[in-house]
Amino acid sequence: MMEVEGSMNRAPDQSSFLRSRRSKALYQFKQQKLPACKPVLTPISVITVFMLMGFVFIPIGLITLRASRDAIEIIDRYDVECIPEEYRTNKLLYITDSSIPKNCTRYLKVQKYMKAPIFIYYQLDNYYQNHRRYVKSRSDQQLLHGLEYSHTSSCEPEESSNGLPIVPCGLIAWSMFNDTFTFSRERTKLNVSRNNIAWKSDREHKFGKNVYPINFQNGTLIGGAKLDPKIPLSDQEDFIVWMRAAALLSFRKLYGRIEEDLEPGKVVEVNLMNNYNTYSFSGQKKLILSTSNWLGGRNDFLGITYLVVGSSSIVISIIFMLLHLKNPRPYGDNSWNKKSLSS
């Protein structure tokens, strides 16, 4: 019986001990007195850190840059070459006059073996898709719900036409890229796949499966491409690609894929329609054929960034080392740090 009473007496003591321990931990947390590591940055440790950063970043940069260079690209600027000689001095007349033929043929020579899939991009330069008025001129709710969503004032000045609402509304949709390309090799047409060129998340969650183009490009001023009114927006992937606005003034957008290998020395014939007006703002248009690698497409920026950071780290470590050898300074008393850790 006494043993039972003894155990009952110990229970309150144990619970009070736990409460005091929790309150002490809470007090230390609130007063910022928790145990912490407070390293002392000595010259040797700083030099070592910068040197290690250089030894790690430079190999990563070389590997990344090598992988980027393994991606093969063919780049062809066609916006000037596709203008007839008599219109070179008046490009706006050429692009705005519908009676002037816009068809053009370009020949791209394959320098290195290009393994399928070969991605087709169009590139626009000096095109500010990130302009605030341009970016805001859209209605994401309308793209998802169609006419069920009527608050489209943000789409001005392309909100309505002839008194009827426009679907899809806004300047971004109105100015959609409308140059077209067909490819052939040795008089044999190359099939271009235009499926799965848009992000899956965009197709499934940002563009409605029951939303169809209505009253689109029916105004007096036609901006760019027209959309098939019989196909829902979620299935018009070239439109979905265009609606993802770029952050920089030069950008690429995926047009399609060639699912055949291209051998060195072969010539790819490109028949294109030069419809899109970039001449009014001194823009440029380019056609790109590109392979991919384990990092994606060709982009030297990441590799160069690693090399610059790694090289800078080594240079900084060498400068610190020379300064330390030339003007050494005695270490300060760090006993205060040891005392705080022990407490």
From Swiss-Prot:
Highest taxon, organism lineage: Eukaryota
Protein name from the UniProt record: Putative ALA-interacting subunit 2
Organ and tissue specificity: Expressed in roots, leaves, stems, flowers and siliques.
Family of the protein in this entry: Belongs to the CDC50/LEM3 family.
Membrane topology according to the record: Multi-pass membrane protein
Annotated GO CC locations: membrane
InterPro entries: CDC50/LEM3_fam (IPR005045)
The keyword ATP-binding is assigned to this record: no
Glycosylated residues, chain numbering: N103, N178, N191, N218
Organism in which the protein naturally occurs: Arabidopsis thaliana (Mouse-ear cress)
